[in-house]
Every structure is written in structure tokens, then in C-alpha cells.
């Protein structure tokens, strides 16, 4: 019975799931917006939000905890140098999930997951 067992299995064993969420978390931190399936996005939120909360207090212990969870030096550097200070005044809710239709091959629901308050990319607009 699965009473009180939280989290989604996503048809993967535990090591595959852990590796997948490490990769997705690193991608989200580096790109600040990624497109994935809706269940993965909802589960990724449970991984990334505590990492950003950890990054709000810059200490060696917190950096080591973040590295243990992501296994990526660049991700840890961006978390503590950029994202921690950016979200210092926000008390949670660092990510936003936007549904974006269904995948062509298998009709899986897709979604964008992004960090809120991310800097807008200046689009090349030509004024005539």
C-alpha cells in the first residue's frame, strides 16, 4: 500500500529519478526556463525551491549541501551568486509552471517551468 508516500514515481527506478531531477534542476538554474512534461515540472518544483531557499544564506555548509544535491559546480555557483541574492526578499514561490499544450508524439501534457522575476531578454525589435 502506498499510504502517505509523497512524490511521483514517473515509471522510473529511484536512481534514474534522482539523476533525472538533478539534471532538470541544473538545467532550470542555468537557463531559468525549461520545457518538460507537466508531472515532471510539478515534481521538479519540489526539488528546486528548497535549493533556492538554501542559497539565500551563503555559507560553506549550505554550498556543500547544494553540491550534494546537484553534483554540479556551475549550478551551485549560480545559485549562491545570482539566485540567492535575487530572491532574498521572497519567502518562497520561486518557480512558475505554465501549461503549453500537448506533445505531438504521445500527447503528453507539456509545461514551461521558469523562475519568477527572471530578467527579460531584450528582443531585437526594428523600428521603422
From Swiss-Prot:
Keywords for this protein: Ribonucleoprotein, Ribosomal protein
Entry keyword annotation includes Ribosomal protein: yes
Gene Ontology CC terms: cytosolic large ribosomal subunit
InterPro entries reported for this sequence: Ribosomal_bL17, Ribosomal_bL17_CS, Ribosomal_bL17_sf
One MF annotation (Gene Ontology) recorded for this entry: structural constituent of ribosome
Disulfide feature: none
Alphabetized Gene3D superfamilies for the sequence: Ribosomal protein L17
BP GO terms, sorted: translation
Known partners and oligomeric status: Part of the 50S ribosomal subunit. Contacts protein L32.
PANTHER family registered for this protein in UniProt: LARGE RIBOSOMAL SUBUNIT PROTEIN BL17M, RIBOSOMAL PROTEIN L17
Family: Belongs to the bacterial ribosomal protein bL17 family.
Name this protein carries in UniProt: Large ribosomal subunit protein bL17
Species of origin: Haemophilus influenzae (strain ATCC 51907 / DSM 11121 / KW20 / Rd)
